[in-house]
Amino acid sequence: MFKTKSVKNILAILILLSVSVMTSQEKFTLSGTISEAQSGETMIGVNVLIPALQTGVVTNQYGFYSITLPKGTHQVTYTSLGFESYSQTIVLNAAVNNSISLFESTEMLDVVILETDIEKTNIKTPQMSVTTLKANTIKRIPVVLGEADVLKAITLLPGVTNAGEGASGFNVRGGAADQNLVLLDEATLYNSSHLFGFFSVFNPDAIKDLTLYKGGIPARYGGRIASVLDIYQKDGNKRAFGATGGIGLLASRLLLEGPIVKDKGSFLIGGRSSYAHLFIPLVDSGNENIAYFYDLNTKLSYDIDDQNKLFLSGYFGRDTFDLGDVFGNTFGNTTLNLRWNHLFSDTLFSNLSLIYSDYYYGLELKFAEFQFDTGIRNFNFKYDFTSYVSDAVKLQFGLNSIYYKFNPGEVFPTTDNSGRNYRKLTDKYAFENAGYIDGTIKVSEKLNIQAGLRLSNFTRLGQESINVYANDNPIIYNQNLDVYQKATPIDTIAVARDASIKSFLNLEPRVSAAYQVSESSSIKASYNRTAQYIHLISNTSSPTPFDIYAPSGQFIEPQLGDQFAVGYFKGFEKFSLEAEGYYKEVKNRIDYVDDADLIANEAIEQVVLNGQTRAYGLEFLVRKTKGNLQGWIAYTLSKSEQRTPGRTAIESGINNGRWYNTAWDRTHDFSLTAQYKLSEKWFLGANFIFQTGRPATFPQGQYEYQGQVVPVYEARNASRLESFHHLDISATWNLNHKSKKRWSDEIVFSIYNVYNRKNAASVSFRENTDTGNNEAVRLSIFGIIPAITYNFKF
C-alpha cells in the first residue's frame, strides 16, 4: 500500500512546513521543569500557555518543557488537572530557565474524572484516539474492590473492551490482546492482568501518568499494531518520607517513598498481594482452588545536576492459580530499567534507556503428571531526542534496538510415574532495530499536523536446529479429507547464532492532522502503518492465559497493520462530545488449523497459516466534567473479522476461506461511569458495562467412528456466548477530608456485579449421565463480590 514516493513526499512536506513557519524575528527560549510542590515529583502533561500569542506547549514524560517566543514581556500560565493554576510575567530578553512547582488544588468540584482532551489546548493538537490519565485523575475514578484500576478505567472507554472474565489483557478496536504494546517506565510488559483480569498489574499508588493510543500512534512507538499503553511510575517524594496503602478483604497494598538526598534523590517501593481465595471460591468445580497474585514496584531517582538525571526502576509480579488435582498455573512479568536524561541545550532534550524485560509462564497438568514452562526475554536499548525547534515546530527522533530470546517450551515430569520425559524445545533468538523521526507542526492558527516515519528491521537469528521442508512448506493440504496436516521435515540444519535466518524491513509512515472549526470544536484525521514481528500463540478458549511467544521467520511473516481514522470533537460548558470512525486492515495475522496442538510443539509453523483481519467501527463519548455529578457515557458499534483463504485454488483455507468473527469481536459495547459528590465526606460511584457476547464455535451434531463419538462443528465463531454485563457500585467515606492535614484515610465499600450476573467465561459440552443427552455447561468465574477496603496516606 505504501510506496517509496509517498515517503519522499511526507519528508518533503515536513521539511518545507518546518521552514515556512519560522520567521526572522528575534526570539528566545523559555524552558524548565515543572514539579509538584509537596513532593518534588516532576509532572507530565502540564500546559504551559501564552494566551496573548494563542500558543503553548506541554511538559514531556520527565516534566521538561521548552518554547521559543518573540523577544519581549509575556504572561505565562501553567495549568494541570487537579492543581492550582499559576501565572507569572516573564521578560524574555535572553534564554530563560523557569522551573516552578504547582500546588495540588483543594477544590474538587471541577476535577475532571476523565481527561481525553483538555479542551482549550488539545482541541488544536493533531493527536486523536488518545486518552490520558494522571495520578490524581486515577484516584477519582469510581472505585471497585477498594482501589482504582487503570485497566478497568480504559475498558470503560469507547473502542476498548476487556478480554472477558477468565482472560487476561484488553482488546482495542478489534485487535487481539497481544497486539497492544504495554509499557511501564518504557519496559515491555507481556501480560497486563492479575487474577484472570480481575486486577491489573499496575499498582495505582505507584502510577504517575498513563496514555493510551488507539490510533494516530507516534513514530517513536513500534512493535505492535493495535495500541500503545504507556505508563510511567512516580519517582518518589524528594522532600519528605511518606506512605500510601490499603487493607481490604481481597487484597492489600503498601507503598513507601522518600528522599535519599533531599531535593535531589528519592526512592519508591510498593507491594501488593491478594488473598481472595481464602474467602471466595472462583469456580464451582468440586476441587479446592487457590488463586492469588503479588507484585513489587521499585524506583530510584537522582538529579546529578540541572542537565542530568538518573532513574533506576523495576517491577516484579506473579500470579498463581491451583485447581486441586487438575492443574496449576503460574505466570508473571519482570522488568528492570536504567534511564539517563540529558539536556544538551534549552531546546534539545534526550533520554537514554537500557531495559530488561522477562515474561514467564508455567502450566502444571497434574492429571498428566508434567509441568510445561515457556517465556520470552528481551534486552532493549533506546535513545530518544526531542528538539524544540520553535513555538510552531517540535521534532522527535531516535533509535531503538531489542535483542529477544524466546523459550518455546520446557517439559518436566512431576512424578516418577509420569509418562513424560524431560524435554527442552530449541530456543529462538532475534534482533529488532528501528529509527524514527516525528514532527509536530503548527501550519496556521487552525491547522496542525503531526507527521513521522519509522524504519524497522527484524532479523531472525540462527539456532541449533531448524527444520527443512520440501518446497519450504511446513503444512500440507489433504484434498481427499479436506484437512491441513503437518509436513514431515526432510532435514534439519544448524545456523550460527550470529547469522541471519530471515530478515524483514518495513517503512511505517504516521500522519495526523487537526483543523479547528471553532474555539471549541475541531475535525481530526489520522493514518498509521505499524509492523509487529512477534506473535502470541494462545488458546483463547482456555480458562488460563496460555501464552507462547514466537518470532517471525522463514515460515511466519510479520503482521502489518494500516489504520485510518476521522473524528469530530466538541466542547461545551459542562459537557464534551467526541465521535470517531476507524477502519483497520492487518496482513499476516496467524490462524490455527483445526485441532492445532500448541503445548510443547517444536515446529509451531506446522499448525499455523497466515491470514488477514479487518476491523471497523464508530465510537462515541459524552463526558460531563463539572459539578457534583461527573462521568461519561461511551458506546462503540464495531466489527472485527478474520479470513484465511487457501494458498492455492484447491485449498479450502480456514472456514472455507470465508470471513468469520474474531474471538474479540463485540458488535455493541456500552459503558456508563458516574461519580457523585454527596458531601465533603462521601463520594458515590457506579460503573455499568454491556457488551455483545464473545464469538464461539459450538458443535452442531456428532457421529460415531470406530466406537468414538466425533463432534461436527459449525462455521468458526458462528455462535456467541450470552451478552456480558454487570453493574458495580461503590461508596467512599473520607474520614479526614481536610486536605492540609498530613494524615488522610478513607473506607471504600464496594460491590462488584451487584445483581450477581453469571457471565459465561466459556461453554463446554458433555453427556448427561442420567438422560444420555448432550448438554451445554457454562463456566462462570465471578459472581457478586462485596468488599471493604481501608485506604490511608501520610
Protein language model annotation of sequence segments:
Residues 378-382, 424, 432, 551-557, ...:
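Outer membrane beta-barrel strand-and-loop segments of large Gram-negative receptors
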Residues 84, 118-120, 124-217, 228, ...:
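Periplasmic N-terminal accessory/gating domains of Gram-negative outer-membrane beta-barrel systems
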Residues 33-39, 46-51, 79-83, 93-147, ...:
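Short, acidic, small-residue-rich periplasmic hinge/interaction motif at the N-terminus
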Residues 531, 587, 681, 690-707, ...:
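C-terminal beta-signal and adjacent terminal beta-strands/loops
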Residues 583-585, 604-700:
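Gram-negative outer-membrane beta-barrel transporters
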Residues 53-64, 502, 506:
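Short, acidic Ser/Thr/Gly-rich low-complexity loop/linker segments typical of extracellular
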Residues 163, 221, 236-241, 261-265, ...:
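Short loop/turn motifs that connect adjacent beta-strands in outer-membrane beta-barrel proteins
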Residues 360, 405-417, 459, 464, ...:
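Surface-exposed extracellular loop regions of Gram-negative outer-membrane beta-barrel proteins
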